Structures are given as C-alpha cells and as structure tokens.
Amino acid sequence: IGISSAGIYVDNRTMLASLFLKVSKEDFDKKVKDIYIRAGKEIGDVPLLVANDGDVTALAGAMELGDTGILGIAMGTSEAAGYVDRGGNVTGWLNELAFCPIDANATAMVDEWSGDIGCGVKYFSQDGVIKLAPAAGIELDESLSPAEKLKVVQKLANDGDEHALDIYRTIGAYLAHTIPLYADCYDIKHLLLLG
C-alpha cells in the first residue's frame, strides 16, 4: 500500500504533521505515530510505504514527463510541495513550503500551527480563497466549515462568476511572485501545479 500524507514520516511513522494540529502530545504518541502502520495491518498486514504528499506529487510529475528538476506543488487544504532533483532523486528534504514565509507584511495572516506570519499555506490553499472572498465581494456563511466555504467559491467560479474567478487570478499573481523565491532554493526545470 502506498500512502501519501502531509508531514514528516520516518519508517512509515508520523513524526510531525499539521493534519493532527488539535491532537494532544499524549494522544499523538499513542494514536497518531503509528496510524498508517495500524491501518495497513487492518487491511491485511501487507507491505506499506508512507511518503510525504509533496514528494509523491513531484515523483509523479517526473514519471509523467520522463524528466527531472521538478518542483511539485499541490494547493488544497494546505500547500504541499516536493522536489525531484536533476539527478532524478527524491531528496528527502523537508519541503514543507506551506510554512515558508512568502509575505513579510506585519499584518499578514498568522499560521496557527507554526505561529509564523505570511506562510504559503495562507495563500495557496482553501485559507487563501476564504481570505480573498470578502475583498471579491463574496459573503460566505460563517457557520460553514472551511471546506464548505471553498466549495461555495469553487461553484461560483465554475459557473463563470467574475468575482470568484478574480480570487483565483489573485492567487495566481501571488504564486507568480513566489516562484522566484522557491527558485532560490530549488533548481527548477519544471513546475507541476495541482489543486
């Protein structure tokens, strides 16, 4: 079984993952660290490999293109990133660009997990869409979950609503300004974007 998930995984064990932000340290150690190992055993005690979702994105891109130097970014609930170097290797680097600051404005949104301001997760994810909705003239029901709010904006965009489309254009502009920052750290030949 191949499992891709946000976070840091060592020997198929969850070492650090914002997915489990609200889980206490005690419960994390007891229930989360071996969550995927236990899931594999429940399915039938079959071989399993857990990898960072961003690395899987980049590897899929390398396989599809038959090339290397790929930075893969998936924008969804968060911002996942992975890299396949010019030698065709998944580097094992900590590619959590979700927590890379991209906005130095003192009033930038604070990421609740890292405590940093202006992190990519707040711009290249559902949080970014929700943040831009009021400026685009879209009111979202506060009782909705973040995923439900995103679906409202996505439906508007799919229906051709210019206000909703402007949100995605703005996120594209953010990304255009951020890619050169990423290129300072990664030798990018191809950029694979999902989300």
Placement of each model-derived feature along the sequence:
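Glycine-rich phosphate-binding loop and adjoining helix at the ATP-binding site
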Residues: 1-70, 102-105
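Basic, gly/Ser/Thr/Pro-rich low-complexity segments located predominantly at protein N termini
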Residues: 7, 11-12, 81-87, 165, ...
